[in-house]
């Protein structure tokens, strides 16, 4: 009601959903009911949910961001932040997010759609159709949604930083992961590889 121009919203991870939406729009289709992970405006009942979108289990399968499609120089011009001496003095800072989801369920958090707990809060406890079968997000037998927090490999994350350095001469990385140090094994491996690649000397974080 507040935004009458809004036809639908994407719930949770958008990579696969946006790809399917693009195909629909390209084909001039106005029927989005078979695209998972949407909330669609419905003239009769207000809105309706399509089937939940399964969480991406392998984050290494997600391509690195196409930074070259952005006007990066405008971004870098105003990228320094007064959070630390390094971030304040940086000339070309970039932000990254590698981890998705959260193993916790804090009621005050605005984080949505990246974990089983998030999806349960959105869709509720009832059955939902997924393909030809009904699923319940809280069902322990259905591992599609049993991924509270996920990380790509440390190599993926380091390659992301190397790309930013080599193509855009970034000198500071803001890692916006919400639970980076909750996975100590991953964090230690990332830090070891970061130093091994010599990035600690040229890209602060």
Where are the predicted features?
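Alpha-helical elements of Rossmann-like donor-binding domains used by nucleotide-donor carbohydrate transfer enzymes
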Residues: 17-20, 24, 37, 61, ...
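A residue-level signal for beta-strand positions that form part of recognition/binding surfaces
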Residues: 37, 47, 61, 93-95, ...
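Radical SAM [4Fe-4S] cluster-binding motif and immediate context
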Residues: 68-205
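Conserved residues at the C-terminal ends of beta-strands
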Residues: 12, 41, 65, 112, ...
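Alpha-helix boundary recognition
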Residues: 2-4, 63, 195
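Conserved, mostly hydrophobic/aromatic
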Residues: 7, 38, 62, 102, ...
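Conserved ATP/PPi-binding loop(s) of AMP-dependent carboxylate-activating enzymes
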Residues: 56-74
């Amino acid at each position: 009601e507040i935004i009458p121009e809004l036809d639908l919203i994407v719930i949770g991870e958008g990579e696969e959903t946006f790809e399917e939406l693009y195909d629909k729009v390209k084909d001039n289709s106005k029927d989005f009911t078979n695209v998972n992970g949407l909330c669609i405006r419905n003239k009769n009942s207000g809105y309706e949910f399509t089937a939940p979108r399964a969480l991406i289990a392998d984050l290494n399968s997600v391509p690195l961001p196409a930074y070259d499609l952005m006007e990066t120089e405008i971004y870098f011009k105003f990228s320094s932040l007064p959070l630390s001496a390094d971030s304040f003095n940086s000339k070309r800072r970039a932000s990254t997010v590698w981890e998705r989801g959260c193993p916790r369920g804090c009621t005050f958090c605005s984080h949505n759609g990246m974990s089983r707990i998030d999806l349960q809060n959105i869709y509720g406890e009832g059955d939902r159709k997924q393909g030809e079968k009904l699923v319940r997000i809280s069902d322990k037998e259905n591992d599609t949604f049993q991924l509270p927090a996920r990380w790509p490999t440390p190599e993926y994350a380091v390659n992301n930083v190397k790309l930013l350095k080599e193509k855009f001469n970034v000198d500071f990385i803001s890692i916006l992961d919400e639970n980076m140090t909750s996975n100590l094994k991953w964090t230690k491996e990332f830090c070891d590889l970061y130093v091994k690649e010599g990035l600690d000397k040229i890209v602060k974080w």
